[in-house]
Structure formats: C-alpha cells, structure tokens
C-alpha cells in the first residue's frame, strides 16, 4: 500500500507534521504501508499539491493549502489562508470527510495533529512530545526573546535551519524515519545534521550583517530591501533582534526560486497586533498567519515584489 504525504517543505512544522501524522497512521494499523513524502512550497519553482502528487492508495496534505480532490483522504492545516477561494472552502465543508481537519486557532499543524490524534483516535506518543512542543514554539515564535530566536548555539535550532534550507522530498524521506525512532535531541546533535549546518552558520552570520546594512526604519516598521543579490534564505526574526522597538518587519529578497516578501509582527515589541498579516499577504497571492506571512513572485517580477513590499510597509506604518 502506498501512502503519499504532501507536507509544507523547508519548514520545521511541515516536517514535524509529517512525523506525527506517520506515527498516527502506524497506530491505525498502517505500519507496513510505504510512505512517500512530498515537500510542497509556494515559490515559483517549488512543487504544489497538484493531482499528479496524489498518486497513493491514501493521500494526505499537511500544513499546506487545501486541494479539492477525490484522491485526498486526509487533511490537516491551521493557516487562515488554507483555502485559496470560497469555492475551495465550500468543497472542504461539503466533503464532510471525517479525516479532514482545519483549525486556524492552532499555532502549529503539528500540535493540531497531536491533539486531534488524542481526542479523535485515542493516540498519543510521549516520545514525540518534545518534537510537538518545539514545533509549536518555532511556528508561533514563542521564544523568550528575539535573540533566542536567532541564536544557533542550540542543536535543535541548528536543525531548524537545516530543515529550512534542505527540506525537500529526499530530506523528508530521511528525517521522518529518524525522528520517529530517535529522540529529537539525538537527531539534532547527529553528525549528519552538524555537517549540513556548517556552511549555513557562516551564511546566517552574513545574513544578519546584511539585514543590519539594508534596514530602513519607517515609523514602527523595519523595511529591508535585499534584492541586490541572491539570498539563500529569509530569516524571520533578525529585524526584531536588531530593532527591538519595531512592531512589524517587511523584508523583500531574491531566492533561488524567485523574489519573496516576508512580513512579520514583532511579539516582543510590547505593542498590540493591529493587522492581519495573512489577509494582507493574501491580497497579493500569498498567505500565512495573522502574525507572519509571505508572498512569492515569478523570477522576472523583482520590481513588482519591491513595489508590493513598500506598499505593505507603508500600510503597516499607519
């Protein structure tokens, strides 16, 4: 039996969701099934949850936008932008599928799967509780400080960076079994993860310095235009550490897959959240959560990405 699990790629919550979901399916008697993992993204060159991916006897989509399909047998998500249109939401509701779960009040998809597994299926695995807890911290940015959020001295935070950089199909196929059978701390401290992190550490340091150089303070917003060179990744919390009094950040850069805008709310600013970032990003074809979101553009749309980023920064500046 083939079970295809399409989850959010290059994302610690996406990876952790795949681990929890696989463990839940094992508990439901499918331990002998072949699990095939697909890492989905929203960048121009990243795979989507298309029909061509849903080729299993069972198919799941996790931590990613809903896809109406008779082939889809399981669905878990917590993003407010899970449904690209009202038609998609209507299809979700009309399906009345007891294995479709959506709850935007959850701060991570991993926690949604863990709680649903316990309430609906009587499933819990104490060995995976550290993974659930940390995935929830990362996806909700519930760190004690912005400095902690960008500190990479903790092996688990180094693992987060590795997942965000390398998290494709092959990486998920390797890491999901590892995290199913080994403690999170052991996987994070493994030589394989350390070797993958080595080049990322220097890149992270350079990224912090470039953010410092390129940042513009626009009232309560920090705007960063980094489109002059190719970025390896877009860090979510660097501006909050560099500008602790900022309330929002808008960063635009060019990744391998094309331009991307990252928008976020600084939870350590001491100021209330007064905008729905997911709704703002959705207006431009992106999505996310009330406190963080992103928008991807085609490779030749750099100038439009820069224009949109400035529009959003102006809106959030009030």
Identify the role of each PLM range:
Residues 140-233:
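Glycine-rich, Lys/Arg-enriched anion-binding loops that position phosphate/diphosphate groups
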């Amino acid at each position: 039996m083939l079970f295809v699990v399409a989850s959010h790629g290059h994302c610690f919550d996406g990876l952790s969701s795949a681990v929890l979901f696989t463990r839940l399916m094992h508990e439901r008697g499918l331990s002998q099934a072949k699990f095939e993992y697909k890492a989905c993204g929203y960048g121009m060159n990243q795979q989507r949850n298309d029909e061509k991916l849903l080729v299993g006897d069972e198919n799941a989509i996790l931590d990613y936008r809903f896809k109406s399909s008779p082939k889809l047998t399981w669905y878990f998500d917590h993003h407010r932008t899970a449904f690209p249109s009202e038609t998609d939401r209507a299809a979700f509701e009309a399906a009345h599928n007891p294995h479709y779960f959506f709850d935007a009040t959850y701060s991570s998809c991993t926690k949604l799967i863990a709680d649903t597994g316990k309430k609906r299926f009587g499933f819990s695995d104490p060995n995976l509780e550290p993974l659930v807890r940390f995935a929830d911290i990362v996806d909700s940015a519930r760190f004690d400080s912005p400095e902690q959020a960008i500190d990479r001295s903790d092996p688990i935070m180094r693992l987060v960076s590795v997942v965000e950089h390398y998290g494709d199909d092959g990486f998920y196929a390797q890491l999901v079994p590892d995290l199913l059978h080994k403690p999170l701390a052991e996987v994070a401290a493994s030589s394989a993860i350390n070797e993958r992190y080595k080049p990322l550490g220097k890149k992270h340091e350079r990224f912090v310095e470039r953010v410092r150089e390129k940042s513009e303070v626009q009232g309560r917003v920090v705007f960063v235009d980094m489109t002059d060179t190719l970025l390896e990744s877009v860090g979510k919390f660097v501006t909050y550490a560099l500008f602790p009094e900022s309330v929002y950040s808008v960063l635009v850069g060019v990744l391998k897959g094309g331009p991307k805008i990252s928008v976020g709310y600084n939870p350590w600013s001491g100021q209330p959240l007064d905008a729905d970032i997911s709704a703002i990003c959705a207006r431009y074809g992106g999505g996310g959560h009330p406190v963080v979101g992103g928008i991807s553009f085609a490779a030749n749309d750099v100038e439009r990405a820069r224009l949109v980023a400035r529009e959003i920064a102006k809106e959030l500046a009030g």
